[in-house]
Amino acid sequence: FVTGEYPVIKDVETAATGLLAALEESDADRIRELVLVDQRTNTVVTHRDVGIGISQVLPVLVMAYGSQEKLLAMEQPEIHLHPALQAELGDVFIEAALGSRQNTFILETHSEHLILRLMRRMRETYQRKEMGLPPVTPADVSVLYVEPDGTRSIVREMPLNELGELVKSWPGGFFEEGLREQFDDA
């Protein structure tokens, strides 16, 4: 990983050319291909051989586990992932934020599964259940809901209590979709 402070780049094209030359001169022999192992079949595969969700989440995992004491902003880190893996991603963020890495995350998500996992871990912390993860409290998680209002957007804080429950009613449309699919008659 690159560390240190660097000046603002004003001429992007010249800087990119210089970086490419430096990469070709010093790092070309160290570049490796990432391979994965399908645990069901014990088969080695590349990121190109797996679903798009797995290849999309790899940079998220690298940033979460490869960074320390950083502010990391991610847009829809759960995109194209199976719902169970979206929930597991919640545990990744808990570990990377509240464990030894101490990262801070700003996540833009549409995933009920990811949010529900954070809420569950908060409840398990309060109930003193062993999770194998750092404890999660309401002070550790801030849920913001952004909704359009004409030509502007309104940001609403949606606080959680120690049981991981929403203190305020959720604005319409988010958690309602799953309930509507389960219980509404057509």
Segments from the language model and where they lie:
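Switch/communication elements of ASCE P-loop NTPase nucleotide-binding domains
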Residues: 2-6, 15-22, 26-182
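Conserved helicase NTPase catalytic core signature
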Residues: 9
